[in-house]
């Protein structure tokens, strides 16, 4: 019998040849189905955490909960568009099932409704308030941290898991989305769960894990449709390549995953498609009331290409974009100009500002460059995206390469290497898509890349410490420290108005010291340890050496995490409301602007300059406080001031991250207008109707009465038609029409509705808002 020792990932890898048979003992953290011993490392990571590990896990979850819940009500209802849909779902089961914006079931939100259901149930139980709307998403964030921790711990150990959880919890865009009611919080949890289930399938070979993987992906599709597909390549690699099963089993399990995915998502799509359109709400975001078009177009290929029915439509397609005769790029240029020079002024008395000649409020095309800059290989590091998720992106890539190399000659089916590969493919798929997609690219989309980035950083940190005796490991680890610190320095320097001027320099100094100290760890140990008489170093390090090591690790952690921590603290301390949000301070260009069909502002003219009345900081009819770069403000909408925490606005009525035309904000509805809309509201199906879901949502939340969102999110969907609206008015089902919703008119039927109302009913002005009583026609 011969024995050879080969260094592998996680420890020594021994091979024994005996009587012609070859037996392989798998290194720590790398067991396969054939070697699932309950001793040593595997016993530690497969069982429930105990002792210090349990204490660390609890501290991690409590810290995450603190970050995601502290002063959560500062964000009021978050995104009114989704909050109103949750409110509607709490009052009507049909609205709950379809995700209707109103419980009269006029039109749905522009997503499948799974992410709305937790908050709808919370509102039903606890009533409508900030906590019932937002707390479910904070809990989804804590669950995401827990699932990532459990996944990394099982295959890479508790240290890697703890670091991974910290990175996920401190990344600014994750803090933003786990304190907000967009679908992204649920999407992140379900994608992380899908990776966990796939890894369990690779480890055990049991079919139930393959099925569960597909279920998580399918549910993710019902949360945010096409974005969940970003994890599919990683799952394919794990199930079809990394898995140690035979090709027949791998093929069968892959097909089982696909079948489970189709069933768990398809049941809803088919049910809606087969449901009689007369007994369900219009499918928001589609041009023909079709769930298929919403799925494949608006939330599918159009997001990538910028063509078709992407959010905001083409020029002239909805509020806040380029008017007819102007291009989407003109809209973006004009939006940035309005944001940067603060020259846009609100229309007086709650009226819309002047429109550019030849156009009504436009859609803004795909809007990608407006929110996140031009597509390029460096897009993730530009002014708009650099502070969101990519603080440790380069470090994660370095960890990926280092980790795979450290796995050495361990078999491909090695589960630790499999996790490295799965996380790496997921991260690269997100990075490539977000860098080059031509369609609408909001900054907060990047939250989907945070779990794989955090997992790779955590695993890389643990491996770097375990193999710190290797020169090349220390060298690449020092490079990861340097790139992370320099990235943090650059991002904070760009936002110097919002942070102490000394902070980026402290991070830079800590980066240099930390990288040098890490590289010099072996020499520190030899120099600081007490030696025996023969000159040898004892196995137990002296207190001095231990102190040096702790200091080095502390400086490294500060260098890598101080930047994202500062951005996250800023995000927590400032209100985040509206449909265009971003973590950290507002950038001077690109935040908000035309393109996603959101309300607010008017379209630039064909030359790209903001028209008179184009409001860079406020909404039509609301005061314009000329917010500064550090305000991240989008001030009041019709009929309300921008200061005060009433109605559906956040504290101070501020909306961060949307300072240019098209950046939708929240409004504070005056008490007088609230009373008017509530007047005899129990006698009508809708207390009021107005153009666009965003404005309607704010009125609905403020009054707790049903408000019809004509035209849906963009204000341009054909729901209801003019004839349908006339019929509802004649049947006395709508009490008021609010002319100033902040979204204005849109081409087609909705402009016709506004014109018809103005022609047949008398206008009254309430606190700057034009309101028509649809029960009182003009005298002929």
What are these regions (language model features)?
Residues 492-505, 512, 667-687:
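Membrane-embedded, lumen/periplasm-facing catalytic core of multi-pass transferases
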Residues 556-683:
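Membrane-interface segments at or immediately adjacent to transmembrane helices
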Residues 575, 641-642, 671-685, 693-706, ...:
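Aromatic/acidic, Gly/Pro-rich catalytic loop(s) in extracytoplasmic/lumenal soluble domains
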Residues 468-590:
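Transmembrane helical bundles and short interhelical boundary loops of multi-pass, membrane-embedded
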Residues 1-53, 59, 327-329, 341, ...:
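Actinobacteria-biased recognition of intrinsically disordered, low-complexity terminal regions
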Residues 279, 287, 719-728:
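Alpha-helical scaffolding within the catalytic cores
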Residues 1-308, 324, 333, 342-475, ...:
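Membrane-integral, polyisoprenol-dependent glycosyltransferases
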Residues 303-334, 338, 399-403, 461-467, ...:
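Short linear, low-complexity motifs centered on an aromatic residue
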